[in-house]
Amino acid sequence: MKTLVVTGFSAFPGAPANPTQSLMARLRRHARRIALLGWRLETRVLPVIYDETAPRLRQIERDLRPDILLHFGLAARRRMFSVETRAQARLNGLKVDALRRLPSPRGLESPDVLRARAGAAKLVAAIARTGAPAASSIDAGGYVCNQTFYASLRLSRAARVAFVHVPPIR
């Protein structure tokens, strides 16, 4: 059986309720149906803490050995689902995490840009088929979402790694 790991994030400054956290609970209810398709579903809620990103992803890699790693993160200013196509070696040094800490000034390792290892166009089309607006994006931001996507692309042995930004749910 192959392993699909899906992650969301906990609350952070500016988002006291993160819809991707509740998405993980909803997905877990479908684990048996997904297993009938030959996939073991594992969900995780990641903390929005700069210093915990890489260690948590290494633990997921070691313990779960995902074949597909799919991250969801909240993008408060976007009005549609955004399938990220690349992550950049940058962090916004002015944005605090859930512990109200700023990122390390050394930032992320090089290379400057890492490209997604998943078919963004197919993922956009799948989201659009549900009736939700979706598009691909070349900017995963400068916060923990970009850091997570960058670290996953760098550390994961998964054949496919993807990141989807979710708009606010009203």
Roles of regions detected by a PLM:
Residues M1-A140, R154-A158:
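N-terminal catalytic or cofactor-binding beta/alpha core of small enzyme domains
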Residues I138, G142-V144, T148:
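Short, electropositive alpha-helical surface patch
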Residues Q147-R170:
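Active-site-adjacent mobile loop/cap segments within catalytic or ligand-binding domains
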